[in-house]
């Protein structure tokens, strides 16, 4: 039986794509996953190009795989994802021992590329953008319980000045409405309880409805998914403030299955920086969205993405960012120092802010958000949370699950039928706040 190893870099879209690669090669060649490249017949790197030096990390990994391939000449090496899309044949030029290179839109052709490599002995490269045809050629997910990703669209058409996504994943293309519902219904019928809707900009979703000319927006899609039997919880990522409509806010008011946690990237709190980033909204407009959201969901927790040290950022700009964070009370968020990405407009902007200043700003922002996050954790102490059990914690003893607000909670398992709890919803009373997790005790064991 052939074995497959996949190393995934970056976002949830890549995690979803890696799962589809595994499903595809299992269906076509009977491959099973392994935890180490040393045991694998096929090794795939599913790459991300969002952060600086992403390419260097990939080629560093490829260098280690080259040494492994010397001892296992039959092993095939593939590079997928956004670095593959960005670099293309340059990957094979720099690392001729790489067998296949494929982009996010051509992963459905992976089996064919591998077959061609074996047949011809030549490295295969396909980084084309055949819109969204890949979903017509991928097998159904093998996920049978717990939480599952469902991609509803691909690409992004916003062209923020610092971002490579439109160049590596293409323009926004939405999956047909019925196709998404069919996939969700199939997962729910297998025992999946939580659906996570994925896209670079999910709230730009506009899916064709059947053979009619009607188009479904993101709000309507959520309403329909909430009606599918077996679906107990709905999440989504990532959304864009520019298209966070009143219709979507209204859905939060009437669809309780949609979690009270929102990840809405703001990137900055200064209008001048937001304009330079080409984000398409002001700080006040972002604050207005959150105010409306908390009017319909008072218990909403908010996380975001922040970039500090963007070219031209002054002390006054940074103070505006801190003021926004203080006003809106963010939970755990992703904070980065700006890193120029080749080929983006922001890479050409003048940047004379010393790195030490940027680092200090980052540390200040992180400390502020960490303090807010800890306050949110403390408020959960003593409360009972509905938790979806994901599996064993890293200690191999406790179970861990995720609350509606996305917090990870550890608890001691019952004496019997631990496996029966995995993928189920249970009630956990929070008893302790730790650095990055919460600890609790099982209240309900209805599945045992």
From Swiss-Prot:
Keywords: 4Fe-4S, Cytoplasm, Iron, Iron-sulfur, Metal-binding, S-adenosyl-L-methionine, Transferase, tRNA processing. This is tRNA-2-methylthio-N(6)-dimethylallyladenosine synthase. Its main location: cytoplasm. Its cofactor is [4Fe-4S] cluster. It is an enzyme of class 2 (transferase). Residues 378-444 form the TRAM domain. Residues 2-119 form the MTTase N-terminal domain. One of its GO terms (molecular function) is N6-isopentenyladenosine methylthiotransferase activity.
